[in-house]
């Protein structure tokens, strides 16, 4: 439930952010995603929520490096699958003055082998 609340908070923040940046009454947003199951799911959920709010949503599938470059050049608006503090740390350091982290769905994300207790 805690993860769901965090995701909901991030999505509400995204809608607020997108509302501030829309011009000429045209509500558009571009969502980027990589081919990872959780990223695809979160991005499609965000797409559905934005469409319910009247946004025209563009979905952009790419690898991580081009996504960060696109975000930094304002060619894309949102990437929901940044793994911090470790996995995407170098990208965040490279583009930190051009990107804004507005929320988190999972704190201290790590990649590795997992063995249940």
List where the protein language model places each region.
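Bacterial N-terminal signal peptides that target proteins for export
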Residues: 1-8
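C-terminal motif of bacterial Sec signal peptides marking the signal peptidase cleavage site
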Residues: 16-19
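Envelope-exposed proteins and targeting segments
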Residues: 27, 53, 109-111
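Short, well-ordered beta-strand elements
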Residues: 25-38, 55-60
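Pocket-flanking alpha-helical
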Residues: 43, 63-97
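A conserved helix-loop-strand patch within extracytoplasmic ligand-binding domains
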Residues: 97-117
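Bacterial signal peptide processing site
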Residues: 21-23
């Amino acid at each position: 439930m805690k993860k769901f609340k965090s995701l909901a908070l991030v999505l509400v923040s995204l809608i607020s952010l997108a509302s501030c940046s829309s011009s000429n009454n045209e509500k558009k947003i571009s969502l980027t995603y990589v081919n990872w199951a959780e990223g695809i799911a979160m991005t499609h959920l965000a797409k559905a929520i934005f469409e319910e709010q009247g946004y025209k949503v563009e979905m952009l599938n790419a690898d991580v490096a081009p996504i960060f470059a696109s975000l930094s050049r304002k060619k894309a608006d949102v990437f929901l699958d940044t793994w911090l503090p470790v996995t995407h740390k170098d990208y965040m350091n490279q583009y930190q003055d051009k990107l804004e982290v507005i929320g988190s769905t999972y704190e201290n994300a790590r990649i590795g082998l997992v063995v249940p207790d």
